[in-house]
């Protein structure tokens, strides 16, 4: 019984560390226009509760708009188009 618990904990921890250490594979074609104006992403700045604060932050750094995106809408994403 102890061996089963130990083996389970070891297996889960190894899978977790492998998931963190694995490089991301991105084989998608990149659009040249998308590369010219990358989005700026920062945590906080009002997200996820005050999207207007995120928008104001993006305007203050010279971007055209801002919105809350990402997991749980916790990242302020600024766009330029």
Curated annotation (Swiss-Prot):
Q: What is the effect of changing residue 72 to A?
A: Complete loss of antibacterial activity
Q: Does the keyword Membrane apply?
A: no
Q: Where is the signal peptide?
A: 1-21
Stated consequence of mutating residue 73 to A: Complete loss of antibacterial activity
Q: What is the effect of changing residue 51 to L?
A: Small increase of antibacterial activity
Provide the residue ranges of the propeptide in this protein.
22-43
User: Which keywords belong to this entry?
Assistant: Antibiotic, Antimicrobial, Cleavage on pair of basic residues, Defensin, Disulfide bond, Secreted, Signal
Query: What is the first-listed, main subcellular location in coarse terms?
Result: secreted
Its localization reads:
Secreted
A GO biological process of this protein is: defense response to bacterium
Gene Ontology CC annotation, any one? extracellular region
| Gene3D superfamilies for this protein | Knottin, scorpion toxin-like
The listed outcome for residue 80 to A is: 3-fold decrease in antibacterial activity
- List the disulfide bonds in this chain: 47-68, 54-76, 58-78
User: What else does the entry mention about this protein?
Assistant: The Cys-47-Pro-48 bond adopts an unusual cis conformation.
**What does the record give as the function of this protein?**
Antibacterial peptide with potent activity against both Gram-positive and Gram-negative bacteria. May kill bacteria via an intracellular action mode to affect protein folding. Does not show effects on tested filamentous fungi or on the yeast S.cerevisiae. Does not act by destroying the membrane integrity, which is consistent with its nonamphiphilic architecture. Acts more rapidly than vancomycin, suggesting it does not act by inhibiting cell-wall biosynthesis. Does not cause hemolysis and has no cytotoxic effect on HEK cells.
Q: Which family does it belong to?
A: Belongs to the invertebrate defensin family.
What does the entry note on its domains? Has the structural arrangement of an alpha-helix connected to a beta-sheet by disulfide bonds (CSalpha/beta).
Report what the protein is called.
Answer: Fungal defensin micasin
Organism for this UniProt entry? Arthroderma otae (Microsporum canis)
């Amino acid at each position: 019984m102890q061996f089963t618990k130990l083996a389970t904990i070891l297996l889960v921890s190894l899978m977790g560390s492998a998931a963190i250490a694995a490089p991301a594979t991105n084989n998608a074609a990149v659009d040249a226009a998308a590369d010219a104006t990358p989005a700026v992403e920062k945590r906080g700045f009002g997200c996820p509760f005050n999207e207007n604060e995120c928008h104001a932050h993006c305007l203050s750094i010279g971007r055209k708009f801002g919105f809350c995106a990402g997991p749980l809408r916790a990242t302020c994403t600024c766009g330029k188009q």
